[in-house]
Amino acid sequence: MKLLTKANRDLRRRGNVRRYTAILLSLIIWILMCECGAADSAFRYEVAEVHPVAGRQGICTEAGYYWVSGSGTLTKYDADWNLVVENTEPFDGYELEVNHIGDIDVYHNELYLGVEYFMDGEGKNIQVAVYDGDTLKLKRVFPFRSDTGQMECSGIAVDPDSRTVYMTSWIDDKSSEYLYMYDLDTGDYKGKMMLNPGPKWMQGIACYDGHLYVTSDDGDADDLAPDHMYRIDPSQSKETGTVLLEKTFDDVIMQGEIEGLSFDKERGQFLLLFNRGARIVAGMPAGFYEGYSEEIHEVFVYDMTEAN
C-alpha cells in the first residue's frame, strides 16, 4: 500500500511539473512576443458563428464550400454547413502505412494533406497527398524528403503566389523550429524557413495577404490557459520568418485543443477548428473532462476587420 501511494504521488508530481512547465513556456513565449512588438495584430476578430463538424484536425474553404479533416476522415460541407460527402477510408491507395491527417488546405478544388503514421506523439511515413475536392479520393502523392529534419506533419498550406506548399511539425524538438517548403507544381523540396522565435506545438497553418499564420496548442486546458495564433512575416529569401503574436483564443466556448485554420477570402472571415471535452496527452485522447462523454469538434467563424 505504501509503494502504491508513493507511485501515485510520483505520478501526480510529474503531472504537475509538466503542467507548470507548459504554463511557464506559454508565459515566456508571450513575453518575448510582446517585447518584439508582436502584440499588434493585423486584424481584429469577432465570433460570428459556431458550427459542429465531423472532424478534429483541419479546415479549409474555397468557392463556397468547406472541407474538414479528422484524424482518419475527410468531410465536405456546402455554404450552409450541410454535409455534401464524406470519406471514412481516406488511406486507400498508399504504399506506406499511414493513419493520421493533420490540418489541410485547398487549391483549385484539390485538397492538400499532410499524411503520416502517428502514435504516442511521434510521426513517420510522412507524405504530401493531393485529393479530389469532390470525391475526396486520393489523386497523387508528392515525394517526401526524409533528410530535411522534419519529424512530423501537423498542418499544410498552399501559397499560389509563390507556388509553395508549406508544412508544419508539431513535435516539440528542433524540427518544429522550421516551416518546410515544397514546390506546388513539381513537388520538389524547396528548403525550410527558420522561425524566430519558434512557436510551440504548431497545429495548423494558412496563407493570407502575404503572411503565414499558425495555430499553436501552447495553452493548458486544465488551467483554462488559452491557445494562440501567430503571424509569420517571411524574409525575402524565405530562409527566416519573424513570428508575431496575432490572437489569443480566450473567446472559445471552453478551453481545449486548438487545431487547423483557414481564411475565407471571399467573405473576409477567419475559420478555426477547435476541440473541447477530451483530455489530450502527447497528442492522443486520454479520457474526458467532467460533464463530457465525447469530444466535440467545432468550427468558429470570425468576422475580420483591419486592426490599424
Q: What is the predicted role of each segment?
A:
Residues 63-64, 108-109, 161-163, 209-211, ...:
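Short coil/turn segments that connect the beta-strands within blades of beta-propeller domains
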Residues 53-60, 95-105, 147-158, 198-206, ...:
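Repeated scaffold domains used in trafficking and secretory/extracellular systems
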Residues 71, 116-118, 169-172, 217-220, ...:
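Short loop/turn segments immediately following the C-termini of beta-strands
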Residues 73-78, 120-129, 174-181, 221-233, ...:
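Structural motif
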Residues 197-238:
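Loop/turn-rich, solvent-exposed surfaces of beta-rich toroidal or solenoidal domains
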Residues 83-118:
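Blade-loop segments of beta-propeller domains
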Residues 46-72, 100:
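Beta-strand-rich domains and repeat architectures in extracellular enzymes and scaffolds
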Residues 44-46, 84-97, 138-152, 192-199, ...:
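Surface-exposed loop and turn segments in beta-propeller and other repeat-based domains
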